[in-house]
Amino acid sequence: MVKIGILGSTGRVGSLLIDDLQNDKDAKLSAVHVTSKLLKTLPQDTIVTNDIKVLFDSCDVIIDFSKPSGTEALLTEVIENGAKKPLVIATTGLNKHQQNLLLEASKLVPILYATNMSLGVAVLNKLVTLASKTLRDFDIEIVEQHHRHKIDAPSGTALTLAEHAASARDLNLDDVRISGRDGNIGARTKDEIAVMALRGGDIVGRHTVGLYNDGEFLELNHTATARNTFSKGAIKVAKWIVGKDAKLYSINDALGL
């Protein structure tokens, strides 16, 4: 039985993790880290703490669906204080410093980082790589749609999809990405990859990667209809990463893609 701790337990997905773990045969909820009141019923033996060290000491693996500042504290505990538990990190919006901490910590403990824990999105990333490499003359446009409360844009998933598309064409995404068009901007350049964000309603998540050419186009789409798509995926990879060597893993590693 894998003992799982949660960072970000008061968030939308964190709340679903608590529910899903209470019905899992191979894993149990052992600890939750809280920074505000937790409005959930927990198993009696669950440790509730606001101390990162206690969280590490109380589980076999930590799932992180927090904010960038929470992820930074988690990684700092590994780097500076020698905490040695595997991490599954799904926080989006990490800045460059936090990304560097992620790389440094992965030399010390196994870390699986994914901007989206959906198994379908993992397959979509592979399809985008294949299509972008094969259809080199096609223009690439990416549109992501989320609920009105999402605070970062574009989504981490959209940026990951764009990274796969750019890498497949030997391009640096920072050199070719645009986030909007307005006014008399001239014709589209050959290599640019547009990543557009839409916000409204209660959309869980929808990502469309379009490849457009004269006479034909291809659109690859993933739509999440329930948020526990992400919690169930995170639990699956948390079980997988226990016992692995220190390294930075992707969800593709866990799925054998």
UniProtKB/Swiss-Prot annotation:
GO BP, one annotated term: diaminopimelate biosynthetic process
Binding site for NAD(+): 8-13, 90-92, 114-117
Record pathway: Amino-acid biosynthesis; L-lysine biosynthesis via DAP pathway; (S)-tetrahydrodipicolinate from L-aspartate: step 4/4
Active site: 146, 150
NCBIfam families: dapB
Function: Catalyzes the conversion of 4-hydroxy-tetrahydrodipicolinate (HTPA) to tetrahydrodipicolinate.
Record field: catalytic activity: (S)-2,3,4,5-tetrahydrodipicolinate + NAD(+) + H2O = (2S,4S)-4-hydroxy-2,3,4,5-tetrahydrodipicolinate + NADH + H(+); (S)-2,3,4,5-tetrahydrodipicolinate + NADP(+) + H2O = (2S,4S)-4-hydroxy-2,3,4,5-tetrahydrodipicolinate + NADPH + H(+)
Chain sites annotated for binding (S)-2,3,4,5-tetrahydrodipicolinate: 147, 156-157
Amino-acid biosynthesis listed as a keyword: yes
Protein name, as recorded: 4-hydroxy-tetrahydrodipicolinate reductase
Keyword terms, alphabetized: Amino-acid biosynthesis, Cytoplasm, Diaminopimelate biosynthesis, Lysine biosynthesis, NAD, NADP, Oxidoreductase
CDD domains for this protein: DHDPR_N
Entry's EC annotation: 1.17.1.8
Pfam families per UniProt: DapB_C, DapB_N
Family: Belongs to the DapB family.
GO molecular function, one term: oxidoreductase activity, acting on CH or CH2 groups, NAD or NADP as acceptor
GO cellular component assignments: cytosol
Subcellular location: Cytoplasm
Biological classification of the source: Bacteria, Pseudomonadati, Campylobacterota, Epsilonproteobacteria, Campylobacterales
Entry superkingdom: Bacteria
